[in-house]
Amino acid sequence: MILSIESSCDDSSLALTRIEDAKLIAHFKISQEKHHSSYGGVVPELASRLHAENLPLLLERIKISLNKDFSKLKAIAITNQPGLSVTLIEGLMMAKALSLSLNLPLILEDHLRGHVYSLFINEKKTCMPLSVLLVSGGHSLILEARNYEDIKIMATSLDDSFGESFDKVSKMLNLGYPGGPVIEKLALDYAHKNEPLMFPIPLKNSLNLAFSFSGLKNAVRLEIEKNAPNLNEITKQKIGYHFQSVAIEHLIQQTKRYFKTKRPKIFGIVGGASQNLVLRKAFENLCDEFDCKLVLAPLEFCSDNAAMIGRSSLEAYQKKHFVPLEKASISPRTLLKKALSE
């Protein structure tokens, strides 16, 4: 089995993945959302301190799953990029300590690649090549995944990410953190869903394949300020509904532009923000339009987790992509290549 560790942001997670058939044997996770809620977003120093507390607790649960028989382990895998440096280092320190004490090889995994492999948790075979939309609090990307070693970034955000924009709008409306589920619920409760959209769709006439949410966020801020004296629940529902609708329509329009050029046969959606059911339905319709098979990460594995890191690390294990402890390091940025001109 491979023991995998995820600590790139505000989720502490450990998992055990069986090498022979890619089955997830154990998965444990502690979320920090309640600790960051009052701040309206993740506080890096607080996240780091909580990882230092939570990772050892999760390791104790892993020990129970193994019956303290560490001979079952064949490698240690750790997310080392991209993410918050102060949280990545907490996971790496644990991984290096385990690798050294158990004399096991160390695998460094890219967090974005891990999200792609969240589509294949508990599955030995993948459906690569495929294209993938990754939407989360830190990223809005279209990826082309031909195989484990060949994953390219085809489109990215020029400013805020999709999930980050939900968090910021939620904060402006005093609705708490994380913003994704709150805004989705707010939009669901709005009664007048057939009215014209009140915010402009970003990059509607741009020739660039990219995402942008800062202009939409600013339009929402102006609308909130305009209604500030009478910002009742109905007004919040209206703003939430129109914001979500425009944000998702922006994703659809840009992805459709990609579809017209690349014509993918299989398209996956991953990342924490991909739990949004309105988004999922919109992409079902888009894929139907282009006769493209849609694959979705299971809801429980959309947000950051060690299970996806374990699944992706199986590929590295088979290829013996091990890293000496003295060369193991972290990076706040991904090393996946950009191919925006393709």
Curated annotation (Swiss-Prot):
GO cellular component terms, semicolon-separated: cytoplasm
Record-linked Pfam families? TsaD (PF00814)
InterPro entries linked to this entry: ATPase_NBD, Gcp-like_dom, KAE1/TsaD, Peptidase_M22_CS, TsaD
Named cofactor requirement(s): Fe(2+)
Q: Where in the cell is it found?
A: Cytoplasm
Which keywords accompany this UniProt record? Answer: Acyltransferase, Cytoplasm, Iron, Metal-binding, Transferase, tRNA processing
As to how many cofactors bind and how, the note says: Binds 1 Fe(2+) ion per subunit.
**GO MF annotation, one:** iron ion binding
Q: Which residues cross the membrane?
A: none
In this chain, substrate is annotated as bound at L134, V135, S136, G137, G138, D167, G180, N276
Residues that, per the record, bind Fe cation? H111, H115, D304
Note whether ATP-binding occurs among the keywords.
no
GO terms for biological process, alphabetical: tRNA threonylcarbamoyladenosine modification
**Substrates-to-products reaction catalysed:** L-threonylcarbamoyladenylate + adenosine(37) in tRNA = N(6)-L-threonylcarbamoyladenosine(37) in tRNA + AMP + H(+)
EC code(s) of this entry: 2.3.1.234
- What family does this belong to? Belongs to the KAE1 / TsaD family.
This chain's function reads: Required for the formation of a threonylcarbamoyl group on adenosine at position 37 (t(6)A37) in tRNAs that read codons beginning with adenine. Is involved in the transfer of the threonylcarbamoyl moiety of threonylcarbamoyl-AMP (TC-AMP) to the N6 group of A37, together with TsaE and TsaB. TsaD likely plays a direct catalytic role in this reaction.
The name this protein goes by in its record:
tRNA N6-adenosine threonylcarbamoyltransferase
Q: Which organism's genome codes for this protein?
A: Helicobacter acinonychis (strain Sheeba)
